[in-house]
Design a protein with these regions (language model features):
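The feature marks helicase ATPase cores and/or their adjacent C-terminal helical subdomains
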Residues: 1-323
Length: 323
């Protein structure tokens, strides 16, 4: 209203169906009124046909209530994709929970491990965040919370993977050696050298034998092949041991030494506006909520995805999107 009063010409651009911050003062009713008669941008650029149809089905009661009719066409594959310009179809899969083995779970795990696609796990709130983190830990999946660094940094994983090769004599870059130093303890580092900064070192590869000769590493370092046994424990023992178990699972399953983490998780309010290749939606809801607010949350959750989506039914009394 302030904008309309003080400005002769103004533009409203947005999607009232994604009004999910009512608790912060957003008014869905106002946005739907503003959208009446607005130009409809018909072509979608994110969701494939399956997710597009699902989202339309989810939001239909609201469209009917406000007498809204939108075209919203499904997206095509982007430039550079092997199917560039073709309609994205996609699939909708179902998981009973995060722990039961089934064909659709195996499809998800296979896609995570054997493609370069991105995955978003999203949910309404607690306890779903615990469910999803336990799932990642169980299957040795690299993951990060949306907007944060990885649960275990790439450099930490690299140290566990590359140390045995370094101990066997393989030369490593100065960068990698500095990363080792961030974790190594007194079992291999010479006393007083734990804070060594490698100033003025030439950026090239070095062997473990060179570091031993320079009195930085102990001679017995070459016999230590397991990084878990020579690194410094950080945090509570129980948490540290769980971290090591998780790291071993990641190494066993295989991971990309470089690049971004492709699997992320967050609640629905956090992921609004983001795009991922695939989306996994947990419909658990633990308290009564306004029906239309539920539908908008569910709509936002699924519409983050391009290709495939997975649905996990509520593990509680209430289901997101059900009165």
């Amino acid at each position: 209203h302030k904008m309309a009063t003080n400005t002769k010409e103004y533009w409203f651009v947005g999607d009232p169906d994604q009004t999910i911050f009512e608790f912060a003062g957003a008014s869905a009713e106002t946005f739907y009124e503003l959208s009446k008669g607005a130009e409809d941008l018909e072509q979608g650029y994110r969701c494939g046909q399956t997710i597009n149809n699902l989202c339309k089905q989810i939001i239909k009661p609201i469209w009917d209530h406000y007498n809204i009719r939108r075209t919203w066409k499904p997206a095509n594959y982007r430039k550079g994709h092997e199917k560039e310009g073709q309609l994205i179809i996609g699939n909708h899969y179902y998981l009973p929970n995060y722990t039961t083995d089934c064909s659709h779970l195996r499809i998800l795990l296979d896609k995570i491990r054997n493609t370069e696609e991105t995955f978003l796990f999203t949910y309404r709130g607690n306890p779903s965040d615990t469910f999803v983190k336990n799932f990642f830990d169980q299957h040795g999946i690299e993951y990060a919370h949306v907007g944060n660094t990885a649960h275990v940094p790439k450099k930490e994983l690299r140290c566990h993977k590359l140390w045995p090769e370094f101990a066997n004599g393989k030369p490593m870059s100065l960068k990698q050696i500095k990363e080792f130093w961030d974790y190594l303890g007194s079992k291999v580092i010479v006393h007083g050298k734990g804070e060594y900064e490698f100033k003025d070192w030439i950026k090239k590869d070095y062997t473990i034998h060179e570091l031993i000769k320079l009195k930085l590493l102990k001679e017995t370092s070459v016999n230590e092949k397991d990084f878990r046994l020579i690194r410094v424990q950080k945090g509570k023992k129980e948490d540290y041991e769980k971290r090591l178990i998780y790291i071993e699972k990641v190494l066993r399953k295989g991971f990309n030494l470089e690049g971004d983490v492709r699997v992320r998780y967050a609640n629905i309010h956090t992921v609004k506006g983001l795009t991922f290749d695939n989306v996994i939606v947990d419909l658990t809801r633990t308290r009564p909520e306004n029906y239309f607010e539920q539908l908008r949350l569910k709509y936002v959750a699924y519409s983050r995805g391009r290709y495939d989506c997975w649905t996990i039914p509520s593990q509680s009394t209430y289901t997101l999107g059900i009165k």
